[in-house]
Amino acid sequence: MFKRKKNAGQKRTTIIDSDSSSEGSGDESALSSAFKRRKNDTQKRTTPTSVATSTKVRAPSFSSTIDHSHSRNLSKTDEATKETILYAKDDSDDSQKLSKGPYKVPFSKPTTTTTVGLKASSNIKSTTSQDYQPDVCKDYKLTGFCGYGDSCKFLHMREDYKAGWQIEREWEIKNREDDPPRDAGGVSRDADTATSRADSGIPDTCPICQGEFKSPVVTQCCHYFCEKCFLAKHKKKQNCFVCGKNTNGVCKPFKR
């Protein structure tokens, strides 16, 4: 068995040696024509493939294309696109200025304006109330109606009541009125002297002018004088004319 050669179908190119130049030129022309024919054959073979690739259908692109070229030519007169306003530099800004000293330290210009708070509104009225009875329903007390009804957890009552501080204040006022007068040392007088003076009442005559009382006044030490006599005596000496205690010029009119 004979093996078939791999280059059995290929054409053989023979080179013929010749002595004359004429023969060489003829052979060269034959070789060049052979090579040209082979080159033309390759071009013919590759032409269908190139045509096929050129006529290949492309897939349509569904991506939307937006033209942004118009955004570059914005009008500089618009308020929103004014570059002069956006990038304007304040002439009064001295933060970039340097001091004239040897270290060239930036300094800030001291502010000459005084900062004040906001002005309060003149058309708003605010009221503040202190709740001393948090267990009483305020709606029911003021209006007699409560939106929660019987399920309200606060007490439904409309009676007048007094808070603890009101009771203590009335108690102090009552004790101040009933308390017997005290002398300059702050020591209360004996009950016997107070009751005896109350039983005896006002003396018949003024101890200064020895006459009847005209517009009587009483001092802190419970001595009675005429108003005119007391003021005249007070200009010279502030002590009581009867007991000698310092009255500090204080007296109050006596009402029978």
Curated annotation (Swiss-Prot):
SUPFAM superfamilies: CCCH zinc finger, RING/U-box. One of its GO terms (biological process) is snoRNA splicing. Residues 1-80, 173-200 are annotated as: Disordered. It is found in: Nucleus. The keyword Electron transport does not apply. One of its GO terms (molecular function) is zinc ion binding. Residues 18-34 have a biased composition (Low complexity). Belongs to the CWC24 family. Associated with the spliceosome. This is Pre-mRNA-splicing factor CWC24.
